[in-house]
Regions:
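A general lysine-centric signal
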Residues: 1, 54, 87-90
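Electropositive, glycine- and tryptophan-enriched low-complexity nucleic-acid-binding patches
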Residues: 1-41
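Acidic, metal-coordinating catalytic cores used for nucleic-acid/nucleotide bond scission
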Residues: 22, 45-59, 74-79
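Hydrophobic helix-cap positions at the C-terminus of alpha-helices
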Residues: 34-38, 61, 111
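The start of beta-strands in P-loop NTPase/AAA+ ATPase cores
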Residues: 43-44, 68
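RNase H-like polynucleotidyl transferase catalytic core
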Residues: 64-81, 98
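C-terminal anion-handling pockets and recognition modules
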Residues: 82-141
Length: 141
């Protein structure tokens, strides 16, 4: 099992990391990594309601990193574009013979980097929540 944390930006540098656990300390460390890779960008992060995401320390850390958090309603992963990336990665893994944990992590890392460069996973989200004008700006129009 590979416990992966991922950041899929609309504009910015995607970040993926593997953690032993999914505790609030791990969440805070990941927030710092996101900020390190995106030092000047405004960061708005969409999260589910996992307990470590909503912990006071996690929220405090996000504020210190200048990251705005948006928590999704319960049972609504379809509102988070990164879930479509995870689903696509799981599809690849399901057709791959995995030699060991390092091999699994390498596949996840490579596919995440590949897929996170595509805005297609966020197309409908961008249009629905940010508007068509923002989408056209991202595309250079």
């Amino acid at each position: 099992k590979a416990n992966a944390f991922g950041f899929y930006p609309v504009n910015g540098i995607p970040v993926i990391d593997f953690k032993e656990h999914s505790k609030k300390e791990d969440v805070c460390d990941f927030f710092r990594q996101i900020r390190l890779h995106n030092p000047t960008k405004e960061i708005v992060l969409t999260l589910d309601n996992f307990r470590a995401h909503k912990a006071k320390d996690s929220i405090k850390c996000a504020n210190e990193c200048g990251i705005k958090l948006i928590f999704l309603p319960p049972y609504s992963p379809d509102l988070n574009p990164i879930e479509f990336i995870w689903k696509s990665i799981k599809r690849v893994i399901s057709h791959t013979f995995i030699k060991d944990l390092n091999h699994l992590r390498r596949i996840i890392f490579e596919k995440f980097q590949e897929y996170a460069k595509r805005l297609s996973f966020a197309d409908s989200w961008i249009e629905k929540f940010l508007g068509k004008k923002y989408k056209l700006n991202l595309l250079g129009f």
